[in-house]
Design a protein with these regions (language model features):
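Short, acidic/turn-prone active-site loops that include or flank metal/cofactor-
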Residues: 29-32, 55
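Glyoxalase I/VOC metalloenzyme domain signal
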Residues: 5-25, 43-200
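Short secondary-structure capping/turn segments at boundaries of alpha-helices and beta-strands
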Residues: 23-29, 36-38
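Extreme N-terminal starter segment of soluble prokaryotic enzymes
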Residues: 1-2
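N-terminal low-complexity or amphipathic/hydrophobic leaders
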Residues: 33-45
């Protein structure tokens, strides 16, 4: 569905992505339930999201998604989100800690998303957040054409085999590559009007 670039501030995240990919991000909005805000980039039927804590909104009484409460450092690719038709069924096939469905809304968009109680997704955040959109509206369809497409998403983790097994019943996409490595890392490559570019 989309990939998430987390940032300490939205302006920092937008500047980093625009510099890396050589294109401008489009509008986004606020998520009052999580006290976050975002800007988006269309990737065909997918999109890229830059997300950060929104200091203008009151802090929630629960952990923010994508473990944003603990985010530090420069903007980076921290999470990916998998679209599903049946969130309840997908959660039944997912590891413990993937989350519980939370009904959310931003402007005309309505969706349910599995949000972990502590804000931290399984496999050190390498397991996807699960989302089910309500109705026919989807951000990717409303975003301007950017000329950017996701070429691949490489997920590096010490427990690569276990992660691959956990994903096997949820998603099959040749762009997703799961690699064994000493520490977790997410790397995305994009085909852009300026050639192949990457984010991590």
């Amino acid at each position: 569905d989309h990939i998430a670039i987390s940032a300490a501030t939205l302006d920092q995240g937008v500047a980093a992505v625009e510099s890396a990919l050589g294109v401008s991000l489009a509008g986004g909005g606020q998520h009052p339930h999580m006290a976050t805000h975002n800007r988006l980039l269309g990737l065909g039927d997918l999109y890229l999201e830059v997300i950060a804590i929104d200091p203008s909104l009151p802090a929630p009484a629960w952990p923010r998604w994508f473990d944003l409460d603990n985010f530090r450092g420069t903007p980076r690719l921290t999470n990916w989100v998998a679209r599903c038709e049946n969130l309840t069924g997908a959660l039944a096939r997912s590891p413990a800690g993937t989350g519980v469905p939370v009904a959310l809304q931003r402007n005309a968009y309505r969706w349910q998303m599995a949000v972990p109680a502590d804000g931290k997704l399984p496999f050190d955040g390498c397991f996807p957040a699960l989302i089910q959109w309500q109705g026919d509206l989807h951000p990717a369809r409303a975003l301007p054409e950017s000329g950017v497409r996701l070429a691949n998403l490489e997920i590096i983790h010490p427990d690569a085999d276990e992660l691959r097994a956990a994903l096997s019943s949820l998603i099959i996409d040749p762009r997703i590559q799961i690699t064994q490595g000493p520490a977790k890392d997410l790397r995305a490559s994009f085909d852009t009007p300026h050639g192949r570019r990457s984010l991590q």
